[in-house]
């Protein structure tokens, strides 16, 4: 079961989440929407182990990166039994 990793537009391009990820799920990609000219991206969500270290590392007030564990995702969609 894979987890869902969402990157929000509040990302400031600091790379903290990328450096915190033990399985290299995240990477930085070019983006003109912030001063750093880069934003986090999650191209390898199948490797996410759900540790949420990226969330803990995020310095923004509203977490720019969120990991939704499989059971959290299905519960929010009303699919859990």
Curated annotation (Swiss-Prot):
Organism: Phalaenopsis aphrodite subsp. formosana (Moth orchid)
Gene3D superfamilies reported in the protein's UniProt record: 3.30.70.20
Reactions catalysed: reduced [plastocyanin] + hnu + oxidized [2Fe-2S]-[ferredoxin] = oxidized [plastocyanin] + reduced [2Fe-2S]-[ferredoxin]
UniProt topology in membrane: Peripheral membrane protein
Coarse class of the protein's main subcellular location: plastid
Subcellular localization, as worded in the UniProt entry: Plastid, Chloroplast thylakoid membrane
Lineage: Eukaryota, Viridiplantae, Streptophyta, Embryophyta, Tracheophyta
InterPro entries, alphabetized: 4Fe4S_Fe-S-bd (IPR017896), 4Fe4S_Fe_S_CS (IPR017900), PSI_iron-sulfur_center (IPR050157), PSI_PsaC (IPR017491)
Binding residues annotated for [4Fe-4S] cluster 1, in chain numbering: 11, 14, 17, 58
Identification of the protein by name: Photosystem I iron-sulfur center
A single GO cellular-component term on record: chloroplast thylakoid membrane
Cofactor(s) listed: [4Fe-4S] cluster
């Amino acid at each position: 079961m894979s987890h869902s990793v969402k990157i929000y537009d509040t990302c400031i391009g600091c790379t903290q989440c990328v450096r915190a990820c033990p399985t290299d799920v995240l990477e930085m990609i070019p983006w003109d929407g912030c001063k750093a000219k880069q934003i986090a991206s999650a191209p390898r969500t199948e490797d996410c182990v759900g540790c949420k270290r990226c969330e803990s590392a995020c310095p923004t007030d509203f977490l720019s990166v969120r990991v939704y564990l499989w059971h959290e995702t299905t519960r929010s969609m009303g699919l859990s039994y």
